[in-house]
Every structure is written in structure tokens, then in C-alpha cells.
């Protein structure tokens, strides 16, 4: 284990919308350090959302993020030879990073032609509480509910 807690590095807000969450999302979409490509994909996905829904792209994005953030998750805990799935609350920073990760993973697995289309469709689905990223959140919550009996093993 590390001696000290790692300092949280500051994140600059993105140049178009001024959102720090969007910057983190762009960084998650980025492959091989190609940030400008990731920005193009993300901004064109948000524009596509605007043309499809008529709402502002950033508002749909924020709504999707709020819908995907998990409140509870399970952690494995070994107690005398048995491994229990112990439900725990998720810290806000982890909620955000899990939400981002789940949306990007779900978008990459979709069958649309371009990443921009996949991402915009996944964000629209997440905003309306559909899609595989939302399903992942629901499954995580169900696991936590099912293992509520082991909540006293929390540490």
C-alpha cells in the first residue's frame, strides 16, 4: 500500500462547454493519446444528440451521467473461509468514474458504424434509462440489494 494518499490532479474544463466531467469523459474515449480525435468524436456525438432530440447535447449528457452513476456496489470480503459480497456505498468520485467507464464500454460494444453514432445513441439511451450501461447499473444495484444481509461485514 502507498504511504500517502495520491494527490488529486486538477482537470481543466473542456474548451467548448466548460465542463470538467466532459473532459474526463473525453479522456476515457481517447485511444493511443489521440485527444483531438476523441474531442471530435465527443463533440460531434453531442451535436448529433441535439439534432435528434432537440435538447441541448450537454444537458442530455449530464442527465445520462446522473442516471448511470451507481449508489451501491458490492465488494468481496473473506470471513473465515467464506467469501461474502458485501454491499457498500460508492463515493462521489468513484460514482463518476464508474459511470463514465460503463458508458464508454457500452458504446464500444454497440453495433453502429462510427464511434460517434455509438456514443450518441448510448448517451441518449442512458438519459432515458435504457441501454446496456443503465442495465449494468441496475445489475450492480440488484447485487447490493440481494446481499443486504452481509452489510454488517462492512469495514
Swiss-Prot record:
The keyword Membrane does not apply. Keywords: Ribonucleoprotein, Ribosomal protein, RNA-binding, rRNA-binding, tRNA-binding. Coiled coil: none annotated. PROSITE patterns: RIBOSOMAL_S7 (PS00052). GO terms for biological process: translation. Signal peptide: none annotated. GO terms for cellular component: small ribosomal subunit. GO terms for molecular function: rRNA binding; structural constituent of ribosome; tRNA binding. Pfam families: Ribosomal_S7. One of the primary rRNA binding proteins, it binds directly to 16S rRNA where it nucleates assembly of the head domain of the 30S subunit. Is located at the subunit interface close to the decoding center, probably blocks exit of the E-site tRNA. Part of the 30S ribosomal subunit. Contacts proteins S9 and S11. Belongs to the universal ribosomal protein uS7 family. NCBIfam families: rpsG_bact. This is Small ribosomal subunit protein uS7. It comes from Sulfurovum sp. (strain NBC37-1). The lineage of its organism: Bacteria, Pseudomonadati, Campylobacterota, Epsilonproteobacteria, Campylobacterales.
